[in-house]
Amino acid sequence: MYVCLCQGVTDNQIRDAIYEGCCSYREVREATGVGTQCGKCACLAKQVVRETLNDLQSAQPVPAFGTTAFVAA
């Protein structure tokens, strides 16, 4: 869906910017142009950023202790 009509930015483009390394709304704004014209989309854009970052964080695997084998040289 379109989040920013002024710049033609979709929620998928915002998510893609995060998947490509953006870690904040500010970085997404700089990468996509979302929220740089009238600003009415900023709240929704921030929500998409927040939800996507939370989804990524919860999807990160947590390493279990004792599962890594070290080989002595």
Curated annotation (Swiss-Prot):
Phenotype for K46E: Probably unstable, it cannot be overexpressed, in truncated protein
Keywords: 2Fe-2S, Electron transport, Iron, Iron-sulfur, Metal-binding, Transport
InterPro entries with a match to the protein in the record: BFD-associated_ferredoxin, BFD-like_2Fe2S-bd_dom, BFD-like_2Fe2S-bd_dom_sf
Pfam family, one: Fer2_BFD
Any one Gene Ontology molecular-function term assigned to this protein's record: 2 iron, 2 sulfur cluster binding
Disruption phenotype: No growth phenotype in iron-sufficient conditions, in low iron conditions iron accumulates in BFR composed only of BfrB, the iron is not mobilizable, increased secretion of pyoverdin siderophore.
Binding site for [2Fe-2S] cluster: C4, C6, C38, C41
CDD domains, alphabetized: Fer2_BFD (cd19945)
SUBUNIT field: Monomer. Interacts with BfrB; up to 12 Bfd proteins can bind to the BfrB bacterioferritin complex (BFR). One Bfd protein binds to a BfrB dimer in the BFR, with the [2Fe-2S] cluster positioned about 22 Angstroms above the heme of BfrB. Does not interact with FtnA.
Stated family: Belongs to the Bfd family.
Name this protein carries in UniProt: Bacterioferritin-associated ferredoxin
The encoding gene: bfd
